[in-house]
Amino acid sequence: MNGDELPFESGFEVYAKGTHKSEFDSNLLDPRSDPIWDAIREEAKLEAEKEPILSSFLYAGILAHDCLEQALGFVLANRLQNPTLLATQLLDIFYGVMMHDKGIQSSIRHDLQAFKDRDPACLSYSSAILHLKGYHALQAYRVAHKLWNEGRKLLALALQSRISEVFGIDIHPAARIGEGILLDHGTGVVIGETAVIGNGVSILHGVTLGGTGKETGDRHPKIGEGALLGACVTILGNISIGAGAMVAAGSLVLKDVPSHSVVAGNPAKLIRVMEEQDPSLAMKHDATKEFFRHVADGYKGAQSNGPSLSAGDTEKGHTNSTS
């Protein structure tokens, strides 16, 4: 046993099946120069020392693996397995995508940093990998999206179904989602087939990015970079939420929202221009209170006379995103 090895490590087999360090190809980020992976391993070792009862759990989920992709694939495979979609099969799927796609490798890390920076309940990188279903669902979606784009649509839809069953988060594999995304809690989030989400967006629980129920083709919302969607927001139709906009909790949005603006209500009304350039990073959720003060202070005709969200108010360019 060397100086860096914990006492329990020599007593467990390596749980990760499939790819080993010697088999990494040139597409994989070098695990020897990955500061996030280094931090994750250090966190896991410290937690194992503090809580010995979890030592085998931490070893199996993190310390047995050579890189972040291996560890994440192992965790996702064990979370999503069922009697007809085995963990070993899922490991092959996740490794086959994550070990060879630099775009997904980048997104995995940017998303992880977003959870660590913006979610006060996320105590560490390792806690996101091991415990946070919003992170799990997002990374499993990324694999399903890759499969969808490769024409393996039945397998992608099977993954979508398992993600929805296990995590309560329904993301169509054809949706296009950027990186640096936070799905805080994640419960009840629904993202439709033609939705587009830009980089750096924060999404709270219960958010729906849906169609109107009657259209086909491009029918779902487009969310600009750095936007913040509060809890239980519903956005319907092929409309744009501008970059850096904030949609307050409980709002129903049916029209375009200007960039760097705050909207709230049912239907949503324009409240003010954002002071913060990146509300998704600030994670301030006070716009709903502002809206009700706005109503209580005498704007009885807000629905008919208040500033409306017309197409002319919006910057029409759709958001940059990764596919």
From Swiss-Prot:
EC number: 2.3.1.30
Superkingdom of origin: Eukaryota
Protein name, per record: Serine acetyltransferase 2
SMART domains: SATase_N
Record-level Gene Ontology MF annotations: serine O-acetyltransferase activity
PANTHER family per record: SERINE ACETYLTRANSFERASE (PTHR42811)
Keyword list, A-Z: Acyltransferase, Amino-acid biosynthesis, Cytoplasm, Transferase
Protein family: Belongs to the transferase hexapeptide repeat family.
Gene Ontology cellular component annotations, sorted alphabetically: cytosol
Record note on quaternary structure: Homomultimer.
Region: Disordered, residue numbers: 302-323
Compartments it resides in: Cytoplasm
First-level EC class: transferase
Catalysed reactions, as listed in the record: L-serine + acetyl-CoA = O-acetyl-L-serine + CoA
InterPro entries: Hexapep, Hexapep_transf_CS, LbH_SAT, Ser_AcTrfase_N, Ser_AcTrfase_N_sf, Ser_O-AcTrfase, Serine_acetyltransferase, Trimer_LpxA-like_sf
Compositional bias ranges of the Basic and acidic residues kind: 313-323
Organism: Arabidopsis thaliana (Mouse-ear cress)
A Pfam cross-reference name: SATase_N
